[in-house]
Curated annotation (Swiss-Prot):
Pfam families: CDC37_M. Self-associates. Forms complexes with Hsp70 and Hsp90. Interacts with CDC37, FKBP4, PPID and STIP1. Residues 2-171 are annotated as: Self-association. SUPFAM superfamilies: Hsp90 co-chaperone CDC37. Residues 84-122 form a coiled coil. Residues 1-11 have a biased composition (Pro residues). This is Hsp90 co-chaperone Cdc37-like 1. The gene is CDC37L1. The modification Phosphoserine is found at residues 32, 88. InterPro entries: Cdc37, Cdc37_Hsp90-bd, Cdc37_Hsp90-bd_sf. It comes from Bos taurus (Bovine). Co-chaperone that binds to numerous proteins and promotes their interaction with Hsp70 and Hsp90.
Amino acid sequence: MEQPWPPPGPWSLPRAEGEAEEESDLDLSPGSPRCPQLPGGGTQMYSHGIEMACQKQKEFVKSSVACKWNLAEAQQKLGSLALHNSESLDQEHAKAQTAISELRQREEEWRQKEEALVQRERMCLWNMDAISKDVFNKSFINQDKRKETEDEDKSKSFMQKHEQKIRHFGMLSRWDDSQRFLSDHPYLVCEETAKYLILWCFHLEAEQKGALMEQIAHQAVVMQFIMEMAKNCNVDPRGCFRLFFQKAKAEEEGYFEAFKNELEAFKSRVRLYSQSPNFQPVTVQNHVPHSGVGSIGLLESLPQNPDYLQYSINTALCSLNSVVHKEDDEPKMMDTV
């Protein structure tokens, strides 16, 4: 019998009582002295680079995570069969063992491919000029520009309006505190919140605030898992986040490992970018007044290679897309806001 989604986790990082305190000197707005501006066209390059980079990595990440997920299910099925002594189950037991063997082999193959991919990243094979030309030759640039612009404006407006609440959620360290806060502010359960938190992680790593980056990464992955669970169950994410927190406390073996691996992979990508030759923080002399557009400030405060950074962001997002699997025996039994 298949196990219910989602995998429990991520397990909260050790924190003091209540939630972690925000650092008072962390101003992420474009007007802040900590948020230098990218040269003209830099922000557009992020927008264009995201689609191309994500498409190139999507199949690899999906296969890798799906393999881990299926292996966990096969191991759990084998464990349940071991509880019975009936000879009629011998055939099922043999099938389960065979499946586990095949899945382990596939997992090792994808692990080797992942290591090779990381090596290519370290060698800086993401040539900015080549990527730029490739991006503008892709057919997706011919899609409806008006809708893209409207969606982007809507996203910026949301993050500008709710920046402080998103940051407050990012600082929470307890499952109950996170669930209670989202219950009070259900509109924060959305893609914009996940994107803001992910960009914040890169900003914190740029400031060498590793411990705080890990805390925000924890909450970013939580939000993305909620979003993927809602997509696979075809429900409003605001109606299923309570179920996520309920299952997150179960700590079932196998699913916990899948989630933990994805969280660690995301944090590794953030650190990898900060150690790359492309990581060259810039400073500016003149600053505009505070505008409060948090996500834009985060983006513009980072180094000037948008292709590599956006690839890292989207690899993190795409890697979570295949961790979630719809379950037939648990169809959309979601609570409502």
